[in-house]
Amino acid sequence: MLYETKTSHNCETVMEKAKDFFNGEWGLEVSSKEDCCALFQGGGGHVFIQCIKDEDKLKVELATREWDRQVKKFMRKV
């Protein structure tokens, strides 16, 4: 499933929050991480998160399999 939200945070902050949330709280492994994106895997699924500049805010795209509830919770945090 693909999700999208906008935030006033910068990409670095979003990636830190994503690592704390998906790796720290839920135990997903960080499979890859760049400045603008990260892939977390575990529990039979994955979460891919990407930051995209969009006018005055930052667009955050999240693609997931098996972690929809957690992705929705994360979107409320950013």
Report the location of each language-model feature.
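Terminal, regulation- and interaction-focused segments at domain boundaries
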Residues: 1-30
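Positively charged, low-complexity terminal tracts
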Residues: 3, 29-33, 42-43, 65-66
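Generic recognition of cysteine residues
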Residues: 11, 36-37, 51
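Short, solvent-exposed secondary-structure boundary motifs
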Residues: 19-21, 36-44
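Ser/Thr- and Asn-enriched, surface-exposed coil loops between beta-strands
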Residues: 31-37, 56
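Beta-strand/loop substructures that line and gate deep hydrophobic ligand-binding cavities in soluble
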Residues: 41-78
